[in-house]
Protein backbone atom coordinates (compact mmCIF):
# COMPACT_ATOMS: atom_id res chain seq x y z
CA UNK A 1 0.00 0.00 0.00
CA UNK A 2 1.14 3.54 -0.74
CA UNK A 3 0.90 6.33 1.82
CA UNK A 4 -2.45 7.66 0.52
CA UNK A 5 -4.12 4.29 0.97
CA UNK A 6 -2.42 4.02 4.37
CA UNK A 7 -4.32 7.14 5.48
CA UNK A 8 -7.71 5.60 4.70
CA UNK A 9 -6.68 2.28 6.22
CA UNK A 10 -5.69 4.18 9.35
CA UNK A 11 -9.19 5.66 9.49
CA UNK A 12 -10.76 2.20 9.11
CA UNK A 13 -8.59 0.74 11.88
CA UNK A 14 -9.36 3.62 14.26
CA UNK A 15 -13.07 3.08 13.67
CA UNK A 16 -12.66 -0.63 14.39
CA UNK A 17 -10.75 0.07 17.60
CA UNK A 18 -13.41 2.49 18.81
CA UNK A 19 -16.19 0.05 17.97
CA UNK A 20 -14.59 -2.36 20.45
CA UNK A 21 -14.43 0.35 23.13
CA UNK A 22 -17.76 2.14 22.76
CA UNK A 23 -21.12 0.87 23.90
CA UNK A 24 -23.95 0.25 21.45
CA UNK A 25 -25.67 3.43 22.64
CA UNK A 26 -22.49 5.49 22.22
CA UNK A 27 -21.99 4.23 18.67
CA UNK A 28 -25.61 4.96 17.81
CA UNK A 29 -25.32 8.48 19.25
CA UNK A 30 -22.17 9.15 17.24
CA UNK A 31 -23.63 7.81 13.99
CA UNK A 32 -26.73 9.99 14.38
CA UNK A 33 -24.61 13.11 14.92
CA UNK A 34 -23.95 15.49 12.01
CA UNK A 35 -20.17 15.25 12.51
CA UNK A 36 -20.46 11.76 10.99
CA UNK A 37 -21.71 13.01 7.61
CA UNK A 38 -21.28 16.79 7.25
CA UNK A 39 -18.97 18.11 4.51
CA UNK A 40 -16.13 20.29 5.82
CA UNK A 41 -16.22 24.02 5.17
CA UNK A 42 -13.32 25.81 3.39
CA UNK A 43 -11.69 26.43 6.80
CA UNK A 44 -11.88 22.72 7.59
CA UNK A 45 -14.22 20.45 9.49
CA UNK A 46 -15.96 22.61 12.07
CA UNK A 47 -15.94 20.80 15.41
CA UNK A 48 -18.71 21.88 17.76
CA UNK A 49 -17.44 22.01 21.34
CA UNK A 50 -20.72 23.47 22.53
CA UNK A 51 -23.89 25.15 21.32
CA UNK A 52 -24.88 28.72 22.08
CA UNK A 53 -22.76 31.61 23.29
CA UNK A 54 -23.17 34.12 26.11
CA UNK A 55 -20.98 36.84 24.56
CA UNK A 56 -23.93 38.26 22.55
CA UNK A 57 -21.74 39.88 19.88
CA UNK A 58 -23.90 42.06 17.66
CA UNK A 59 -22.42 40.69 14.44
CA UNK A 60 -22.73 37.00 15.34
CA UNK A 61 -24.81 34.75 13.07
CA UNK A 62 -25.53 31.90 15.51
CA UNK A 63 -28.60 33.53 17.04
CA UNK A 64 -30.26 33.62 13.60
CA UNK A 65 -29.53 29.88 13.36
CA UNK A 66 -31.60 29.20 16.48
CA UNK A 67 -28.79 29.01 19.03
CA UNK A 68 -29.26 30.80 22.33
CA UNK A 69 -27.18 32.92 24.69
CA UNK A 70 -27.14 30.02 27.17
CA UNK A 71 -24.15 27.88 26.17
CA UNK A 72 -23.99 24.16 26.76
CA UNK A 73 -21.11 21.75 26.17
CA UNK A 74 -21.56 19.54 23.12
CA UNK A 75 -23.24 16.28 24.17
CA UNK A 76 -20.83 13.83 22.52
CA UNK A 77 -18.08 12.34 24.66
CA UNK A 78 -14.56 12.76 23.23
CA UNK A 79 -14.31 9.20 21.89
CA UNK A 80 -17.83 9.47 20.46
CA UNK A 81 -16.94 12.52 18.38
CA UNK A 82 -13.77 10.80 17.15
CA UNK A 83 -15.88 7.80 16.13
CA UNK A 84 -18.35 10.10 14.37
CA UNK A 85 -15.48 11.62 12.38
CA UNK A 86 -14.22 8.18 11.35
CA UNK A 87 -17.64 7.55 9.81
CA UNK A 88 -17.61 10.81 7.86
CA UNK A 89 -16.81 10.04 4.19
CA UNK A 90 -15.05 13.39 3.75
CA UNK A 91 -12.54 13.03 6.59
CA UNK A 92 -8.92 12.00 5.97
CA UNK A 93 -6.65 11.40 8.99
CA UNK A 94 -3.62 13.71 9.18
CA UNK A 95 -5.05 15.88 6.38
CA UNK A 96 -8.51 17.28 7.15
CA UNK A 97 -8.23 20.58 9.03
CA UNK A 98 -10.18 20.77 12.31
CA UNK A 99 -11.72 24.18 13.07
CA UNK A 100 -13.05 24.81 16.59
CA UNK A 101 -15.24 27.80 17.44
CA UNK A 102 -18.03 28.03 14.87
CA UNK A 103 -21.29 27.93 16.87
CA UNK A 104 -19.90 28.77 20.29
CA UNK A 105 -16.89 30.29 21.99
CA UNK A 106 -14.71 27.23 22.68
CA UNK A 107 -13.24 28.64 25.90
CA UNK A 108 -16.37 29.68 27.77
CA UNK A 109 -16.54 28.31 31.34
CA UNK A 110 -19.28 25.95 30.11
CA UNK A 111 -17.33 24.69 27.07
CA UNK A 112 -13.61 24.96 27.83
CA UNK A 113 -13.26 21.48 29.33
CA UNK A 114 -15.04 19.89 26.37
CA UNK A 115 -12.92 21.90 23.91
CA UNK A 116 -9.65 20.74 25.44
CA UNK A 117 -10.91 17.13 25.56
CA UNK A 118 -11.88 17.26 21.88
CA UNK A 119 -8.58 18.82 20.80
CA UNK A 120 -6.62 16.15 22.68
CA UNK A 121 -8.62 13.15 21.48
CA UNK A 122 -9.11 14.22 17.87
CA UNK A 123 -5.39 14.93 17.57
CA UNK A 124 -4.43 11.72 19.42
CA UNK A 125 -6.57 9.46 17.25
CA UNK A 126 -6.80 11.23 13.88
CA UNK A 127 -4.03 13.87 13.88
CA UNK A 128 -6.33 16.49 12.34
CA UNK A 129 -4.48 19.85 12.35
CA UNK A 130 -6.12 22.02 15.02
CA UNK A 131 -7.32 25.61 14.74
CA UNK A 132 -9.26 27.46 17.43
CA UNK A 133 -10.87 30.89 17.04
CA UNK A 134 -11.62 32.70 20.29
CA UNK A 135 -12.35 35.95 22.09
CA UNK A 136 -11.51 34.45 25.47
CA UNK A 137 -8.59 35.28 27.72
CA UNK A 138 -5.97 32.59 27.17
CA UNK A 139 -5.27 31.40 30.69
CA UNK A 140 -2.32 29.19 31.64
CA UNK A 141 -4.69 26.21 31.88
CA UNK A 142 -6.04 26.83 28.37
CA UNK A 143 -2.55 27.31 26.94
CA UNK A 144 -1.18 24.14 28.52
CA UNK A 145 -4.32 22.21 27.58
CA UNK A 146 -4.08 23.13 23.90
CA UNK A 147 -0.33 22.49 23.77
CA UNK A 148 -0.77 19.09 25.39
CA UNK A 149 -3.31 18.21 22.70
CA UNK A 150 -1.85 19.57 19.46
CA UNK A 151 1.46 21.41 20.08
CA UNK A 152 1.24 23.07 16.65
CA UNK A 153 -2.35 24.26 17.05
CA UNK A 154 -3.25 27.51 15.32
CA UNK A 155 -5.06 29.91 17.66
CA UNK A 156 -6.88 32.93 16.23
CA UNK A 157 -7.58 35.81 18.61
CA UNK A 158 -10.56 37.81 17.38
CA UNK A 159 -10.34 41.60 17.66
CA UNK A 160 -12.52 43.84 15.49
CA UNK A 161 -12.80 46.93 17.71
CA UNK A 162 -11.04 48.34 20.76
CA UNK A 163 -13.52 51.09 21.57
CA UNK A 164 -17.09 49.95 20.90
CA UNK A 165 -17.93 47.56 23.72
CA UNK A 166 -21.60 47.52 22.67
CA UNK A 167 -20.59 45.31 19.73
CA UNK A 168 -19.26 42.64 22.10
CA UNK A 169 -21.08 43.37 25.37
CA UNK A 170 -20.10 40.22 27.28
CA UNK A 171 -16.82 39.29 25.63
CA UNK A 172 -13.54 39.97 27.46
CA UNK A 173 -11.85 43.32 26.90
CA UNK A 174 -10.01 43.15 23.55
CA UNK A 175 -6.78 44.59 24.96
CA UNK A 176 -6.79 41.86 27.60
CA UNK A 177 -7.31 39.28 24.85
CA UNK A 178 -4.25 40.63 23.05
CA UNK A 179 -2.24 40.68 26.26
CA UNK A 180 -3.10 37.04 26.96
CA UNK A 181 -2.19 36.15 23.37
CA UNK A 182 1.25 37.64 23.95
CA UNK A 183 1.71 35.44 27.02
CA UNK A 184 0.55 32.42 25.03
CA UNK A 185 3.16 33.14 22.35
CA UNK A 186 5.87 33.22 25.00
CA UNK A 187 4.75 29.76 26.15
CA UNK A 188 4.97 28.34 22.63
CA UNK A 189 1.38 28.61 21.37
CA UNK A 190 1.06 29.68 17.73
CA UNK A 191 -1.25 32.69 17.82
CA UNK A 192 -2.48 34.95 15.03
CA UNK A 193 -4.65 38.04 15.16
CA UNK A 194 -8.12 37.46 13.70
CA UNK A 195 -9.65 40.66 12.31
CA UNK A 196 -12.97 39.19 11.30
CA UNK A 197 -15.53 40.38 10.67
CA UNK A 198 -14.35 43.70 9.27
CA UNK A 199 -17.20 46.04 10.20
CA UNK A 200 -17.24 48.99 7.76
CA UNK A 201 -16.83 52.31 9.51
CA UNK A 202 -15.53 50.62 12.66
CA UNK A 203 -12.82 48.03 12.11
CA UNK A 204 -11.15 49.84 9.22
CA UNK A 205 -10.88 53.02 11.33
CA UNK A 206 -9.42 51.16 14.31
CA UNK A 207 -7.17 48.80 12.37
CA UNK A 208 -3.95 50.71 13.02
CA UNK A 209 -4.57 50.74 16.79
CA UNK A 210 -5.47 47.04 16.78
CA UNK A 211 -2.32 46.16 14.83
CA UNK A 212 -0.15 48.37 17.03
CA UNK A 213 -1.44 46.78 20.24
CA UNK A 214 -0.95 43.29 18.78
CA UNK A 215 2.55 43.94 17.46
CA UNK A 216 3.55 45.30 20.87
CA UNK A 217 2.72 41.87 22.36
CA UNK A 218 4.68 39.95 19.75
CA UNK A 219 1.86 38.88 17.44
CA UNK A 220 3.20 38.88 13.88
CA UNK A 221 0.50 37.26 11.74
CA UNK A 222 -3.10 38.13 10.95
CA UNK A 223 -6.17 36.70 9.23
CA UNK A 224 -8.66 39.14 7.70
CA UNK A 225 -12.29 38.35 6.99
CA UNK A 226 -15.44 40.06 5.80
CA UNK A 227 -18.82 40.53 7.46
CA UNK A 228 -22.04 38.72 6.61
CA UNK A 229 -25.34 40.11 7.84
CA UNK A 230 -28.97 39.17 8.23
CA UNK A 231 -31.81 41.58 8.89
CA UNK A 232 -31.46 41.06 12.64
CA UNK A 233 -27.66 41.38 12.59
CA UNK A 234 -27.95 44.69 10.76
CA UNK A 235 -30.51 45.85 13.32
CA UNK A 236 -28.21 44.86 16.19
CA UNK A 237 -25.23 46.59 14.58
CA UNK A 238 -27.23 49.80 14.18
CA UNK A 239 -28.34 49.60 17.84
CA UNK A 240 -24.67 49.22 18.76
CA UNK A 241 -23.67 52.46 17.07
CA UNK A 242 -22.68 51.24 13.60
CA UNK A 243 -23.80 53.47 10.72
CA UNK A 244 -26.44 51.42 8.90
CA UNK A 245 -25.73 53.08 5.56
CA UNK A 246 -22.09 51.96 5.72
CA UNK A 247 -23.34 48.36 5.63
CA UNK A 248 -26.28 48.73 3.26
CA UNK A 249 -24.25 50.31 0.47
CA UNK A 250 -21.91 47.30 0.50
CA UNK A 251 -24.49 44.49 0.48
CA UNK A 252 -23.85 41.94 -2.26
CA UNK A 253 -27.62 41.44 -2.57
CA UNK A 254 -30.80 42.52 -0.76
CA UNK A 255 -31.36 41.21 2.76
CA UNK A 256 -33.63 38.18 3.06
CA UNK A 257 -34.71 37.56 6.63
CA UNK A 258 -32.25 35.21 8.33
CA UNK A 259 -30.26 34.60 5.14
CA UNK A 260 -26.63 35.67 5.52
CA UNK A 261 -25.62 38.26 2.93
CA UNK A 262 -22.03 39.19 2.18
CA UNK A 263 -20.89 42.74 2.92
CA UNK A 264 -18.39 43.65 0.20
CA UNK A 265 -15.17 44.79 1.80
CA UNK A 266 -12.27 44.03 -0.54
CA UNK A 267 -11.17 47.68 -0.41
CA UNK A 268 -11.14 47.62 3.40
CA UNK A 269 -9.27 44.31 3.42
CA UNK A 270 -6.66 45.80 1.09
CA UNK A 271 -6.29 48.85 3.32
CA UNK A 272 -5.82 46.74 6.46
CA UNK A 273 -3.54 44.30 4.63
CA UNK A 274 -1.23 47.14 3.58
CA UNK A 275 -1.18 48.49 7.13
CA UNK A 276 -0.43 45.04 8.53
CA UNK A 277 2.41 44.48 6.08
CA UNK A 278 3.90 47.84 7.04
CA UNK A 279 3.94 46.58 10.64
CA UNK A 280 5.70 43.41 9.49
CA UNK A 281 2.73 41.07 9.86
CA UNK A 282 2.35 37.94 7.78
CA UNK A 283 -1.13 38.36 6.28
CA UNK A 284 -2.95 35.09 5.73
CA UNK A 285 -5.54 35.10 2.97
CA UNK A 286 -7.84 32.73 4.86
CA UNK A 287 -8.07 31.06 8.25
CA UNK A 288 -7.10 27.69 6.78
CA UNK A 289 -3.83 29.19 5.51
CA UNK A 290 -2.88 30.07 9.10
CA UNK A 291 -3.55 26.45 10.09
CA UNK A 292 -1.44 25.15 7.20
CA UNK A 293 1.47 27.40 8.21
CA UNK A 294 1.15 26.52 11.88
CA UNK A 295 1.52 22.82 11.07
CA UNK A 296 4.31 23.25 8.53
CA UNK A 297 2.23 21.97 5.63
CA UNK A 298 2.03 22.83 1.93
CA UNK A 299 -1.44 23.02 0.37
CA UNK A 300 -2.72 23.71 -3.14
CA UNK A 301 -6.29 22.44 -2.75
CA UNK A 302 -8.14 25.66 -3.57
CA UNK A 303 -7.91 28.74 -5.77
CA UNK A 304 -5.90 30.81 -3.27
CA UNK A 305 -3.13 28.22 -3.12
CA UNK A 306 -0.48 27.11 -3.09
CA UNK A 307 -0.07 28.07 0.55
CA UNK A 308 3.19 27.93 2.51
CA UNK A 309 5.44 27.61 -0.52
CA UNK A 310 8.48 27.74 1.77
CA UNK A 311 7.65 24.12 2.55
CA UNK A 312 8.19 21.47 -0.09
CA UNK A 313 5.05 19.74 -1.33
CA UNK A 314 4.67 16.24 0.11
CA UNK A 315 6.01 13.68 -2.33
CA UNK A 316 3.37 12.25 -4.63
CA UNK A 317 3.71 10.22 -7.80
CA UNK A 318 1.30 8.66 -10.25
CA UNK A 319 1.53 5.26 -8.59
CA UNK A 320 0.32 6.77 -5.29
CA UNK A 321 -2.72 8.22 -7.02
CA UNK A 322 -3.48 5.05 -8.97
CA UNK A 323 -3.40 2.98 -5.79
CA UNK A 324 -5.78 5.42 -4.08
CA UNK A 325 -8.25 5.38 -6.99
CA UNK A 326 -8.19 1.58 -7.13
CA UNK A 327 -8.72 1.40 -3.37
CA UNK A 328 -11.75 3.67 -3.81
CA UNK A 329 -13.08 1.58 -6.70
CA UNK A 330 -12.67 4.30 -9.33
CA UNK A 331 -12.20 3.20 -12.94
CA UNK A 332 -9.81 5.60 -14.63
CA UNK A 333 -7.94 5.83 -17.94
CA UNK A 334 -4.92 7.77 -16.76
CA UNK A 335 -3.56 10.17 -14.16
CA UNK A 336 -1.12 13.07 -13.99
CA UNK A 337 0.45 14.57 -10.87
CA UNK A 338 2.34 17.77 -10.08
CA UNK A 339 2.77 19.98 -7.00
CA UNK A 340 -0.45 21.93 -7.64
CA UNK A 341 -2.94 19.44 -9.04
CA UNK A 342 -3.84 15.85 -9.75
CA UNK A 343 -5.57 15.12 -13.05
CA UNK A 344 -7.76 12.08 -13.47
CA UNK A 345 -8.85 10.93 -16.93
CA UNK A 346 -12.25 9.21 -17.04
CA UNK A 347 -14.47 7.93 -19.85
CA UNK A 348 -17.16 10.20 -18.47
CA UNK A 349 -16.78 13.31 -16.34
CA UNK A 350 -19.04 12.15 -13.54
CA UNK A 351 -17.34 11.32 -10.24
CA UNK A 352 -18.88 11.17 -6.80
CA UNK A 353 -18.37 14.61 -5.28
CA UNK A 354 -17.25 13.03 -2.02
CA UNK A 355 -14.56 11.00 -3.81
CA UNK A 356 -13.23 14.08 -5.59
CA UNK A 357 -13.10 15.95 -2.28
CA UNK A 358 -11.40 12.99 -0.61
CA UNK A 359 -8.69 12.87 -3.29
CA UNK A 360 -8.01 16.61 -2.93
CA UNK A 361 -7.81 16.35 0.85
CA UNK A 362 -5.54 13.31 0.81
CA UNK A 363 -3.13 14.88 -1.70
CA UNK A 364 -3.46 18.56 -0.63
CA UNK A 365 -3.85 19.33 -4.32
CA UNK A 366 -6.64 20.49 -6.59
CA UNK A 367 -8.38 17.58 -8.31
CA UNK A 368 -9.15 18.03 -12.01
CA UNK A 369 -11.39 15.54 -13.83
CA UNK A 370 -10.77 15.20 -17.57
CA UNK A 371 -13.13 13.45 -19.97
CA UNK A 372 -10.93 11.26 -22.16
Description of each model-found segment:
Residues 1-49, 62-74, 93, 334-339, ...:
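N-terminal [4Fe-4S]-dependent radical SAM core
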Residues 2-6, 208-372:
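Auxiliary Fe-S-binding modules of radical SAM enzymes
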Residues 30-35, 84-89, 270-272:
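Intrinsically disordered, low-complexity boundary segments flanking structured domains
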Residues 46-66, 300-306:
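Local cysteine-cluster metal-coordination motifs and their immediate loop/turn environment
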Residues 59, 70-71, 110-112:
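Short, glycine/acidic-enriched capping/hinge loops at junctions between secondary-structure elements
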Residues 70-88, 320-329:
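Short microdomains enriched in Cys/His and/or Lys/Arg
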Residues 79-268:
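Conserved AdoMet/S-adenosylmethionine-binding subsite of the radical SAM
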